Regions:
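Residues in well-ordered beta-strands of folded domains
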Residues: 11, 86, 118
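Conserved Class I SAM-dependent methyltransferase catalytic core
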Residues: 39-96, 101
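Mobile active-site "lid"/loop adjacent to the S-adenosyl-L-methionine
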Residues: 3, 8-12, 17-44, 48
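Residue-level detector of flexible, active-site-proximal loop/helix-junction positions
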Residues: 2, 89-92, 107
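Alpha-helix initiation/capping motif
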Residues: 34-38, 92, 121
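SAM/dcSAM-binding transferase cores
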Residues: 94-140
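Phosphate/oxyanion-binding loops and surfaces in catalytic or ligand/nucleic-acid-binding neighborhoods
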Residues: 20, 78, 106
Length: 140
């Protein structure tokens, strides 16, 4: 990403970045690269998203709640603003663990929604099934 300079911008960038910021890296280097932000900090994602997006482009990302809030605050410096925020709850009554965020250059108020993953152990919500059925075989 740091050395990627395409001739044109992108209308949509979708990212599932490394989550772990201040934790012990895994002994396996490949696993650490995928899970820890050491080589790709979230702030750098914003810099590159702003650079790579078209004027009406969307940057979509999933992060733990705390990191997502920090990313939103940092994104404002680069004139990227939350357009959609989905709070992902593990099950009913639990606080959200993740945020799905869509950032754009528009300064409109964000559309906020909630998504519950499981209604009970291994009993997934209809919304979650609809969202993941094309990716997870067990969701058919």
């Amino acid at each position: 990403l740091q050395a990627f300079f395409p001739a044109i911008g992108y209308d949509c960038i979708l990212c599932n970045p490394p989550f772990f910021v201040h934790s012990t890296p895994a002994p396996d280097n490949g696993r650490s690269l995928a899970r820890h932000t050491g080589t790709l900090p979230h702030t750098e994602l914003i810099v590159h998203a702003e650079r790579l997006l078209t004027p009406h482009g969307k940057f979509q990302v999933i992060l733990p709640v705390e990191e997502a809030c920090q990313l939103i605050a940092y994104a404002r410096r680069y004139h990227l603003f939350p357009r959609k925020i989905t709070r992902v709850h593990p099950n009913p009554g639990k606080a959200p663990k993740r945020l799905l965020i869509q950032l754009t250059r528009q300064t409109l108020p964000p559309v906020e929604t909630d998504l519950t993953v499981e209604l009970s152990r291994h009993h997934y919500s209809e919304e979650y099934i609809a969202l993941t059925r094309e990716f997870y075989l067990k969701m058919e």
